[in-house]
Regions:
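A conserved helix-loop-beta module that forms one wall/lid of the active-site cleft
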Residues: 1-58
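C-terminal active-site "lid" helix and adjoining low-complexity regulatory extension at the edge
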Residues: 1-8, 12, 168-171, 175-178, ...
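Glycine-rich phosphate-binding loop of ATP-grasp-fold ATP-dependent ligases
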Residues: 24-26, 45-89
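A short catalytic or substrate-binding loop motif that flags glycine-/basic-rich loops and adjacent residues
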Residues: 39, 51-53, 113-117, 197
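Phosphate-binding site of ATP-dependent enzymes
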Residues: 42-43, 76-155
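Short beta-strand micro-motifs enriched in acidic
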Residues: 64, 123-127, 206-210
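A long amphipathic alpha-helix within ATP-dependent nucleotide-binding catalytic cores
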Residues: 96-108, 133, 145-206
Length: 252
């Protein structure tokens, strides 16, 4: 089954879609000028490996303007460092990324659940008719001391309905979830036009305080087992069924 690991390649492809483009945070290749430019524009950015998974290597960078000047801070895992000037901070980040290729992306101030940020995984798979279907959705809450939500990085999976309850209710909530599923579907269709052969994708989406969804990443080898963390197993059974149809978990 085909996969595509480069976040930069996937970003460039998605930017070609009129339906998807407006949900992609501004993203550039990592260098000294691009990080500073986006920091000045947004005050908060994320630096992430071009090739990577499970939230490993993701760094949050903040710019705080004060009367005495600018202060810079970054967090990597549970550790954070502060600097009085940009050059020192950039040098430190450059050393920590171990010469790998990185991206810098506009930071999104995401919604929180119990004072912890969360994002959403939309699972989109080819079904029995070989048509794309948004087969599953789940929320992922970050560890209190971490900036990433991945289950493999101490994140906690929860029903999306639970996480959205404070912000949208009733039929409006169901309509909102349908819109998220449709966004995942549109991404799968568009990506498959440029790179035929995909059978599954996992779309990671963050929601800002105006309830706008932002596409953080499209994973072309998504882990279906996260859905087993939900008490209601119906979604998990569907996701696993489609995964097997698509060639996952074959017996050796």
């Amino acid at each position: 089954m085909r996969t595509l690991t480069s976040k930069w390649t996937k970003t460039l492809v998605l930017l070609k879609s009129n339906k998807v483009r407006r949900y992609i945070p501004e993203t550039r290749l990592f260098n000294k000028s691009s990080v500073l430019s986006l920091l000045k524009k947004y005050q908060m950015v994320y630096v992430k490996p071009v090739n990577g998974s499970f939230g490993q290597g993701v760094i949050r960078v903040d710019l705080q303007r004060t009367k005495s000047g600018s202060k810079y801070r970054y967090q990597h895992g549970t550790a954070s460092r502060s600097f009085g000037n940009y050059d020192a901070m950039y040098s430190s980040i450059s050393k920590s990324k171990l010469k790998r290729s990185y991206l810098v992306q506009k930071g999104i101030h995401m919604l929180k659940y119990n004072n912890r940020v969360f994002d959403i995984r939309i699972m989109v798979q080819k079904n029995r008719e070989r048509k794309w279907e948004a087969s599953g959705y789940i929320g992922r809450v970050a560890h209190p001391k971490k900036i990433v939500t991945n289950f493999h990085n101490s994140g906690k999976p929860l029903p999306l309905e639970t996480l959205l309850e404070r912000f949208v209710q009733g039929e409006q909530k169901q309509a909102y979830i349908r819109d998220l599923k449709n966004l995942g579907y549109q991404i799968a269709v568009h990506l498959n036009k440029h790179y035929p052969g995909f059978r599954e994708i996992g779309v990671d989406i963050g929601i800002d305080k105006e309830l706008k969804p932002w596409i953080f990443e499209v994973n072309t080898a998504p882990d279906p087992l996260i859905f087993n963390q939900l008490k209601d197993k119906r979604m998990f059974r569907k996701v696993i069924h489609y995964a097997r149809l698509n060639g996952r978990f074959r017996k050796k």
